[in-house]
Amino acid sequence: MKYDIMGDIHGCFQEFKTLTTKLGYNWDSGLPIHPEKRQLAFVGDITDRGPASLQMIEIVWELVIKQKQAYYAPGNHCNKLYRFFLGRNVTIAHGLETTVAEYKALSSNEQAIIKHKFIDLYEQSPLYHILDNNQLIVCHAGIRQDYIGRADKKVQTFVLYGDITGEKHPDGSPVRRDWAQNYTGNAWIVYGHTPVKEPRFVNHTVNIDTGAVFGGKLTGLRYPEMETISVPSSLPFVPEKFRPIS
């Protein structure tokens, strides 16, 4: 099977549609379908900050759950939205407020439908995907070599948030270790979470979060070709979001 793996979309539906079209997907049915049966995979964070988070939920639910033609690994924003929909006490900030505003603008019936779809998508999706006979791992923030095959709390924290040190940058964002430098496995790990100006290949890992929602690009990785394709963001560029990997 051949895959096209999408970086963090964050509600940037138009960029997603443009990128998938560029990758050869046909939207005539209202969904991106590839004539050669390539399948999409998502590294998570499909919502928050961008203008069309609910549209992304609809599309990804349809592809992953109903059609079973795509793969989705949840990100930290997905986890927080899931907890919001469960009625947990979460802080509506850091992008969640845009998704909640879209949600609150719906009728109660429409709210019930989108809430059900996202909970369904989240609960039916694994923490990360191991594909192509263990040669490809799709996850949100990466995964350490010795964590592959596990899904305990420690692994969940790593996969959703990265290799956090517990320290904070001046803007409040967490300091993360560069785990990819220590990866020696043969399987390709494709992930996002930390915005980079260009796709970042280190050992057999690649970060494809090129900051679409921060005015960068939306990037897709063609696997097994290992070719990246990007489309520019329509949103304003926010340079401070593209921090050097420490």
From Swiss-Prot:
<comment type="similarity">
    <text>Belongs to the PrpE family.</text>
</comment>
<comment type="function">
    <text>Asymmetrically hydrolyzes Ap4p to yield AMP and ATP.</text>
</comment>
<dbReference type="GO" id="GO:0016791">
    <property type="term" value="F:phosphatase activity"/>
</dbReference>
<protein>
    <recommendedName>
        <fullName>Bis(5'-nucleosyl)-tetraphosphatase PrpE [asymmetrical]</fullName>
        <ecNumber>3.6.1.17</ecNumber>
    </recommendedName>
</protein>
<dbReference type="InterPro" id="IPR050126">
    <property type="entry name" value="Ap4A_hydrolase"/>
</dbReference>
<dbReference type="GO" id="GO:0005737">
    <property type="term" value="C:cytoplasm"/>
</dbReference>
<keyword id="KW-0378">Hydrolase</keyword>
<dbReference type="GO" id="GO:0004081">
    <property type="term" value="F:bis(5'-nucleosyl)-tetraphosphatase (asymmetrical) activity"/>
</dbReference>
<keyword id="KW-0342">GTP-binding</keyword>
<dbReference type="InterPro" id="IPR041780">
    <property type="entry name" value="MPP_PrpE-like"/>
</dbReference>
<dbReference type="InterPro" id="IPR023937">
    <property type="entry name" value="Bis(5'-nucleosyl)-tetraP_PrpE"/>
</dbReference>
<dbReference type="InterPro" id="IPR029052">
    <property type="entry name" value="Metallo-depent_PP-like"/>
</dbReference>
<dbReference type="GO" id="GO:0016151">
    <property type="term" value="F:nickel cation binding"/>
</dbReference>
<keyword id="KW-0533">Nickel</keyword>
<dbReference type="InterPro" id="IPR006186">
    <property type="entry name" value="Ser/Thr-sp_prot-phosphatase"/>
</dbReference>
<keyword id="KW-0547">Nucleotide-binding</keyword>
<dbReference type="Pfam" id="PF00149">
    <property type="entry name" value="Metallophos"/>
</dbReference>
<dbReference type="InterPro" id="IPR004843">
    <property type="entry name" value="Calcineurin-like_PHP_ApaH"/>
</dbReference>
<dbReference type="GO" id="GO:0005525">
    <property type="term" value="F:GTP binding"/>
</dbReference>
